[in-house]
Amino acid sequence: MKNNSIKTVVATGIGAALFVVIGHLINIPTFVPNTSIQLQYAVQSLLAVVFGPVVGFLVGFIGHTLKDSLTYGPWWSWILASGVFGLVVGLTKKRLRIQEGIFEGKDILFFNLVQIAANVLAWGVIAPVLDILIYSEAANKVFAQGLVAGIANSITIAIAGTLLLVVYAKSQTKTGSLSKD
């Protein structure tokens, strides 16, 4: 158990730091105010699949909190949504065989269906509803922001997140691939 705790802390720390750095460096504005295309969710997805839902949640929650704190201040509705996104994607850890070096077509499809569902939940429900409840934001504005963020994140994760997972899986030793000469 101790080894898992150390892995969780290290993965969370590195993931949160990457979330902040990538979020600041790659921030492509969209036509919707205060909404941009961001690639850090691809890295969060990789870490969530490899290390599980706790790391997925913490990378999003801590990383987004730090990222917001370095700019305009924490926006808790979106911070929580980032955490929930990572948690949901992290639930795929037990189903995907990425640690065994296997990430095939059906795994890619499953991963992308889950990440799209997680994006719908995070950006189509949690972030806008909490924006309305916590910050009294206009519903049409926050649902437009959530829609654009969810679509952008789904596409970037489908491309960059899938690519990261394919590369990671290829770096792992496949079960039964080693033989004694």
Swiss-Prot record:
InterPro entries: ECF_substrate-spec-like, UPF0397. It is a multi-pass membrane protein. Pfam families: ECF-ribofla_trS (PF07155). Keywords: Cell membrane, Membrane, Transmembrane, Transmembrane helix. It is found in: Cell membrane. GO terms for cellular component: plasma membrane. The keyword Cell membrane applies. The keyword Transferase does not apply. The chain crosses the membrane at residues 9-29, 46-66, 70-90, 108-128, 147-167. NCBIfam families: PRK13661.1. PANTHER family: UPF0397 PROTEIN BC_2624-RELATED, UPF0397 PROTEIN SPR0429. Belongs to the UPF0397 family. This is UPF0397 protein SSU05_0404. It comes from Streptococcus suis (strain 05ZYH33).
